[in-house]
């Protein structure tokens, strides 16, 4: 489920990236050309990461710095163009609409758990990783709120009309055509950074799962003798992302990604409740969630509510996928013995 969430998230981001390019150059809205761009995108990022983690990290660091600058400049300089009347809430969505919107919106907040894949290289991970995740989520939340506020304040009700590239339209209102171009490029770089970081980290989860015989695919644990990288896992992951991006749109992939990771979070939440019962046995140096059972129970309620907004065909699809994974899990030992 975690890998499905990551691959479908990459597919969603890839679609959003091409949508943004298409807002400037309509020719990129052609389906054949979109698929070709997906191929180049995933093949290039896969190749960079096969060559080595150093090259992959350099790309991630450079893109991370580059993508934040336009967003911060937009937030800082847009306040003078904000109209207070545009921030007034004139109508409240129904509970059903709010649930469907929240399921897609949740897509923007996932990914913090990726830091767990490198927890073995972090000093005192049981304490520092949870704190790091909390700080990063709060920081991202504040940035999202500021961006939404200035966007709504500048564009008002017309914001809903710009689904493909809204921030660039805001920048156009504030800075003129040069602002539109810079934010469009910045948004594309931001999405490219997301893809590059995912293709850097998630294949190593597949590699470890195969090596530990959690996945019945021995080939995923192969290491490239020249670059010392899990090349088969990287190729498999990049190929999966390309196929999902080619056959699904942004909204469809975002919902699949959100629902998949919510199911993972559901399991984690239930585990936290169980661990709370044995809290007295834990060492004092570990991070502890304050409030007793309050936070995990609230999380459980919210997750169930979000998942309840899935359509029937999506529920059936996830049910079939979970059944398939369960069968593979119970057969994996026999498969490994045959290999």
PLM regions: where:
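Transmembrane helix-loop junctions in multi-pass membrane proteins
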Residues: 14, 48-54, 83, 178-179, ...
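Membrane-interface loop-to-helix entry segments
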Residues: 18, 32-81, 92-94, 133-136, ...
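Alpha-helical transmembrane segments of multipass membrane proteins
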Residues: 24, 43-47, 75, 148-150, ...
